[in-house]
Structure formats: C-alpha cells, structure tokens
C-alpha cells in the first residue's frame, strides 16, 4: 500500500504575490448620548487573528471592543485565511506589508492594532516598520523573537488538519461531518478548545465569493478554507520565526500593552528582554491562562483592551471633547 499523504513535490504551488487585499468586517460602536464624544474615527482599531483563525473567530469580542472604546473595529482575514487570497510568501515582512496596504486602501492614516499570536507578531512588526501608521497596539501573548520551542504546537495543528483531509476524508453529504472531523483531530489535538477554533475554517460547501487555486470543492469532501498542504512548512517555520534583519535597530516608542498568559510559553525571559528593548513604552497585564487567552479569559482580555485604548485615546484630543474636562461641552444627541 502506498501512503495516502500527498508528496510535497507534486503539490500545486500557490501564486507569489507581494501584497493581497485583505477581506474584512467593520464593527461600528453604538451611538453615544454625547454627540461630541471623541470617538476618533480617524484612528480605528484593526484586529489581527492567530494562525488558522479568521475575522469571524472573535466577532462578538470585536463588537464589545468597538462599543467599549467608542471606536470602529476592523477584523481582517490574513492571507491564506478566511476570504483573503491564497498566496505566498507567508513571512512576517509580507504579512505586515499586507496590513500597511490594507490601511492605505481603506484610507486609514493612523490605526490602533490588536494582534493575537500570529497576529501579535504581525502587529509588532507593523509598529516597528511603520510607526507613522500605528498609534498604539495591544499584543496578546507573543514576543518579537524566534520561537523554535513552539514548533511542536504548530506541527500538531497541521497534522490534525491534514489528517482530516487525507485520512478521514469525510463527505460533504455526511450530516455529522463536523463531529467526525473533531473526532479525527483528537489523535493530534486532545484540547477541545483548539479543535473548535480550527474547525471554524472547515466547511462542507464552498462559501459565496471564495476562490482558491488549490482548495477543490469538486471532490465531494469537506475542506478547510486554508491551503493546508501548501502551508505545511510555512505554518511551522514562518510562524515561529521573527525577521531580525529587517528590524535591526528599530524601536517603537508608542504605547503598547502586552497581555501575557501566565501558563503560556510564548513570552519567555528572552522575549521579555527584547520587548523592553524595542518597545520601551510598554505595559503588561498578566492573566491566569494558557496561550488560549481569548477563549479562557474573554471578558478579562476585552476589558484590558478597552481600558488601555480609553486611557490613551485623549492624548491628542481637544480638551472640549474630553468628558470630565472643565472645557467639555455637554451637547447631548438624543437620536440613539
């Protein structure tokens, strides 16, 4: 018997694209009774998800952040995720360039970044390379260093997803397809929360508007919305990497909040040292969680984000727009 595993040499390659347009959702804040509340719509929040996540992963949290900060929140799909194009390369310099291009296309001249895991490293790099674009940032459980010690985690993610595609081969017509996929992934991922997050990208029919040169829905089998086979190496090597050459000598002096999981290995002593060096204007919040902070401590991390952005939002605001300031004008708009 020959193995069912597809040989890498026979795989169809992804196209090479320097930048790709990022799919997004925009969550607007609820209207305030105070018409002139400084919502800073010119400085929205851009939320970047983790590996194999999507703009839909934490949709409710993003809406809460929009309401809690009176600020629009863009949730985006990173390349090779969700509704965004499948293309290489997948290195951090390219992913940060995608963020810059997204802001340019949307006409955003100053943004606040929130990044989790993979998205955290992208956010840190974007702040370092494009400080004129990034007003401030919240970095959730990651550090600006190479992390070979987390390669095992990435390998398990990829193995579990490949197992569904190449071994389980679940038909799209199977009514219990998602539970069967979860059961198949248990061999590599006993953690149900992680499986649930990865399964968000698993579908039994082609979504409207979805296009990929390598994901084939004509086979009659359930598919991930990620090009898993083509990303097998990148998801391990590129995700755990950090671009030391392109960031040499760079520092970001804007305010940055780091949220660290006390049970997570992602921010170690080396990472802490590097953070202090290149992000001198940093604050830390420790939460009693593993790396899965967004699932284990959702209310806590959302509050940390809102408190941080609210504390820094008025640094450049006119005094008559700041609630509590002696010059604040209490004009109330009752059209809510």
Swiss-Prot record:
Subcellular localization: Mitochondrion
Annotated keywords: Hydrolase, Mitochondrion, Transferase, Transit peptide
Similarity field: Belongs to the AB hydrolase superfamily.
Presequence boundaries: 1-14
Name of this chain's protein: Ethanol acetyltransferase 1
Database matches in Gene3D superfamilies: alpha/beta hydrolase (3.40.50.1820)
Active site: 117, 141, 291
Signal peptide span: none
Lineage, top ranks: Eukaryota, Fungi, Dikarya, Ascomycota, Saccharomycotina
Function: Alcohol acetyltransferase that catalyzes the synthesis of ethyl acetate from ethanol and acetyl-CoA. Can also function as a thioesterase by hydrolyzing acetyl-CoA in the absence of ethanol, as well as esterase hydrolyzing ethyl acetate.
């Amino acid at each position: 018997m020959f193995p069912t595993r597809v040989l890498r040499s026979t795989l169809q390659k992804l196209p090479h694209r320097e930048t790709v347009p990022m799919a997004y959702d925009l969550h607007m804040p609820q209207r305030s009774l105070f018409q002139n509340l400084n919502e800073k719509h010119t400085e929205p929040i851009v939320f970047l998800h983790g590996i194999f996540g999507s703009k839909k992963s934490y949709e409710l949290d993003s809406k809460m952040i929009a309401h809690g900060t009176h600020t629009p929140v863009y949730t985006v799909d990173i390349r090779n995720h969700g509704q965004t194009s499948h293309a290489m390369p997948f290195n951090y310099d390219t992913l940060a360039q995608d963020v810059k291009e997204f802001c340019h296309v949307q006409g955003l001249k100053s943004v606040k970044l929130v990044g989790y895991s993979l998205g955290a490293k992208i956010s840190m790099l974007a702040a370092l390379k494009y400080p004129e674009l990034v007003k401030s940032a919240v970095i959730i459980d990651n550090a600006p260093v190479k992390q070979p010690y987390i390669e095992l985690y990435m390998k398990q993610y990829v193995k579990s997803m490949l197992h569904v595609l190449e071994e389980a081969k679940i038909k799209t017509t199977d009514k219990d397809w998602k539970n069967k996929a979860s059961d198949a992934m248990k061999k590599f991922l006993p953690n149900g929360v992680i499986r649930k997050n990865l399964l968000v990208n698993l579908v039994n029919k082609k979504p409207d508007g979805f296009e990929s040169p390598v994901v084939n829905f004509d086979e009659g089998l359930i598919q991930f919305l990620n090009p898993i086979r083509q990303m097998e190496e990148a998801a391990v090597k590129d995700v755990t990497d950090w671009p030391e050459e392109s960031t040499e000598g760079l520092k970001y002096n804007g305010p940055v909040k780091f949220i660290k999981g006390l049970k997570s290995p992602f921010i170690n002593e080396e990472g802490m040292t590097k953070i202090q060096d290149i992000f001198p204007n940093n604050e830390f919040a420790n939460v009693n969680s593993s790396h899965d902070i967004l699932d284990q401590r959702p209310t806590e991390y959302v509050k940390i984000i809102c408190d941080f952005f609210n504390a820094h939002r008025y640094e450049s605001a006119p005094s008559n727009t700041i609630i509590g300031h002696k010059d604040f004008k209490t004009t109330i708009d009752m059209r809510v």
